[in-house]
Design a protein with these regions (language model features):
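Feature captures the catalytic ectodomains and active-site-proximal regions of enzymes
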Residues: 1-403
Length: 403
């Protein structure tokens, strides 16, 4: 049996007045997704427990079959795993965004989609000016970077589970004054964030960006900290070998911790300009070597964060044409198979950030008896009697291990 999971990140949304009361999924031309729905079933799942933030880290952990209430320790440790950065028992990983803050308002949580090369230069400057034997700055992908705090038994890190931080993508166009880190260790985090302003102010990268009419990276924003999680390997838990295709370190890290093969796709950017067709091709190739392939696409989520309705629809249509369609055709030649399409969480355009709530799931393949669904969208899922309020249990159902 071959399995494919396709994750159009954050694609679940609300009805839009501009679309005559339809959601982006309803408005988009997605014949391949609709064919999966018609050939199989559409249902609902919830991957965002009410008392945890609706982050992709928590939601994707649940989506991949792991209870976040049991295994989740923070976002940054997952991204550290993606970069191959080892974490000892006293170490903490901290997500480090490069952001643009003007007049204490979060103008851009991506520093204007700063490039990885530019980010690497700024992170090197931060390491030189702010780093130490205990505090290390690590460049990642674009605006997504890391700080690692190296602790030891005699001098443990000052942080704890009570340290509170705010994701910068929750603050777009809002004041940041009430959202700085608080709790144990927050003084250190806030000092690093403040000190980075002086490091970046006259940096050549920012001067060049401003001269080109681009937003500068005014400072770092620290959040999502945690220690290394202890996740059972997917092969031990489910008996299958997997592979992950994504441009986002969070998903790469989850895949690494699960023991999955990492497949890097040329042209995969984690943004709206990603090479959708290449992701589809590489997924089909990977099916020859592993049992399960997971394809994650960030573009739909990024469009919502930016509040771009048309961009979200265009991303959905590109995913359908270049990823879902070719993969579904290839799978049918590899019978037996199963395919599942679902986002991790809703990212409503109205909010420009993640939200708790149900997501629509389309599933088809061997031994899946079709229901009456004809389309893949939120209203169709809402009418389904099948519901997984504990979304991490959905994986057992998808793999045919539960009814």
């Amino acid at each position: 049996m071959k399995y494919v999971i396709i994750i159009p990140d954050g694609c679940a949304d609300e009805a839009q007045e501009a679309l005559g009361g339809r959601t982006p999924l309803e408005a988009a031309h997605t014949p391949a997704m609709d064919q999966v729905a018609a050939d199989g079933i559409v249902l609902r799942a919830n991957h965002t427990p009410a008392h945890l933030p609706p982050g992709s880290d928590i939601a994707c952990m649940s989506l991949l079959g792991y209870n976040p209430l049991e295994y989740y320790t923070g976002r940054a440790p997952l991204e550290a795993a993606a970069q191959g950065i080892p974490l000892g028992p006293y170490d903490w990983a901290i997500r480090c965004n490069l952001v643009t803050i003007e007049d204490q308002v979060m103008r851009s949580f991506t520093a204007g989609q700063i490039s990885s090369a530019e980010a690497a230069e700024l992170m090197a400057a931060a390491q030189e000016k702010l780093g130490s034997e205990r505090i290390r700055f690590y460049p990642g992908v674009g605006y997504r970077n890391l700080v690692i705090y190296r602790g030891n038994p005699e001098e443990p890190a000052p942080f704890s589970a009570d340290t509170r931080t705010t994701p910068p993508h929750d603050l777009t166009d809002q004041s940041v004054l009430d959202h700085y880190p608080r709790g144990p260790g927050s003084d250190l985090l806030n000092q690093l964030m403040t000190d980075s302003i002086g490091v970046f102010a006259e940096h050549p990268v920012n001067l060049a960006r401003q001269a080109a009419g681009k937003l500068p990276a005014t400072n770092i924003w620290l959040w999502g900290l945690g220690q290394a999680p202890k996740l059972p390997r997917f092969a031990d838990r489910f008996g299958l070998q997997g592979a992950m295709i994504t441009a986002v370190d969070l998903l790469r890290g989850l895949g690494a911790l699960l023991g999955w093969r990492r497949i890097d796709v040329p042209g995969a950017t984690g943004y709206l300009d990603t090479d959708y067709a290449a992701k589809g091709r590489y997924a089909i190739q990977a099916l020859q070597e592993v049992d399960l392939v997971c394809v994650h696409i960030e573009a739909t989520d990024e469009a919502s964060h930016e509040g771009h309705l048309e961009a979200k629809i265009q991303a959905l249509e590109a995913i359908d044409q270049h990823i879902v369609g070719p993969i579904y055709q290839a799978l049918q030649k590899l019978d037996p198979y199963r395919i599942m399409i679902l986002p991790d969480h809703p990212t409503p355009l109205r909010l420009k950030t993640h939200a708790h709530g149900d997501v629509p799931v389309a599933m088809a393949g061997s031994d899946i008896r079709p229901d009456e669904a004809q389309r893949y969208d939120e209203p169709t899922a809402a009418r389904s009697a099948r519901y997984f309020p504990e979304g991490w249990k959905l994986m057992d159902f998808f793999l045919g291990r539960s009814a």
